[in-house]
Amino acid sequence: MKKMLSIVASTAVALTALAQQAPIAVRWEMGRNGAEKGYYSSRFVIKNVSQSPLEKNWQFYFNQFSRRLKLGDQLPVDIKEVSTTYYQVTPNDRYHTLAPGDSMVVDMLMRGTMVNICYVPMGGHVVMNGDTKKPIGVKIAIAPLDNPEQFQSRPNDYPDGNRMYAFNQTLQDAQAPAHCYDIFPTPKSVTLTGGHTSIGNVVAVKGGKFGDARRFMLDELKKRGVYATGNTSTTITLKADKKLSGEAYEMVVNDGKVLITAGSELGCMNGVKTLISALDHSKANRLENAVVKDSPDFGYRGFMLDVSRNFTTFENMKRVIDLLAYYKLNVLHFHFCDDEAWRVEIPGLPELTDVASRRGCTFDEKEYIAPIFDGNGNPDDLSQSSNGYYTRQQMIELLKYAKSKGVKVIPEIETPAHARAALVAIRLATISMPLPIWQWRSNTKCGTTTTRAFTPLPNHITTMCSTWRMRACSTFYIRWLTNLRRCGKMQD
């Protein structure tokens, strides 16, 4: 009952915060790279958009890749990095009350080079009177990057739209006329045999060996207004032939009949995907008669999706799987945990999602972790990519959904490096460095080397990943490689 009341109260606070209007509007403007050796210039323009004078009782927070700051000694605000990538802007003694409609400019020099839009500030929010439980979201307006010196440190080091357009202009038109089998990925062999086969609203489907491929095909045809029935002369036949190995298939389209032959379920599914793609690229479902032969060059055709840093919904995950299947990618590398968050419910460790799937304005991280990347400072706002997780039931459904479309899901468990979110959540006292110092620094590589830190994980990991899992060891330090004790732990 107490937990339910806590959730209701938390939600009420979240809705109140969302309903509030921020007293400031913030615009970020890029200056130029190399404004000072090793630094680029930028500025915030902070405007009082409220109806009252803005005193010193506010702090503005934002996220940005960690950069060493250089500030002028006459600025009316101080800027400090609260935790890695999380910055606080606070009025100082030089600050003068901002009247309604007035603005102030905060000029900054930041270490490094601005080369990509992902380097700009994001996740803005303002706190009034030090009340971090009631952050108010501030959408940071980003001024256009119009000049090359704003996003290039060397000539042509970033392929902007003009450069890509000029490159495309150099490509010559294809010599052969296009047909419906000009799809991606392109089949190895397409021989047009003359004539056409029209796929109407109804077809007869024959062959029952490849159940998954058959169900997938019927579902995709239905989405395109084509239904299976036994009373029509247009037929689609799925046939098994052991002479075709692996994921190879052949498809023959001829005078109202489509024959897909394969030696395996996945091979047949590839043939079905070619048929579906050809229909999408045809005019009124009118296929050229042809013999199509194809097989993938790579058994692993993967796509890595990082939902730790930027969460996406369960429905969006299914859409991603749909796209992978359509383009014959067969592996979803599922990066669901990192320093920034843990996104999958694990029975027995509720704190992993109670704490580590939520990011909000905090300095102690007792209830949720500090902001990074986008968000509005509110840990309970599920409209933000900073917050959210997948339930155990959703994960089971996602795995089944992927399998039905010929896609294998490989969850990635980030250990021992980049495991900060999980370690913050389970509050272990075995971490060898202070938690606020992390990401891009050496303790990411070797700060979490004690055995106890990862004791709770193996049993719970196996409940989720009974077939495949990847334990990412992306940031090994040289001291790991020369330390037999640590190497032994990893082997265990």
Residue map of PLM features:
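Bacterial Sec-dependent N-terminal signal peptides
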Residues: M1-P23
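Low-complexity, acidic Ser/Thr/Pro/Gly-rich terminal tails and inter-domain linkers that flank the onset
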Residues: Q20-G38
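Short acidic, flexible loop segments centered on an aromatic residue
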Residues: G34, P53-S83, M122-H125
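Short, solvent-exposed loop/turn segments enriched in Ser/Thr/Gly
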Residues: A35-R43, M104
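Asparagine-centered strand-capping/turn motif at beta-strand->loop junctions
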Residues: V45-S52, W468-R469
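Intrinsically disordered, low-complexity Pro/Gly/Ser/Thr-rich segments with frequent PxxP/GP/PP motifs
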Residues: Q74-V115
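Acidic, contiguous N-terminal accessory segments
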Residues: V120, G124-P296
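Feature activates predominantly on carbohydrate-active enzymes
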Residues: L244-G246, E250-M464, A472, R485-D492
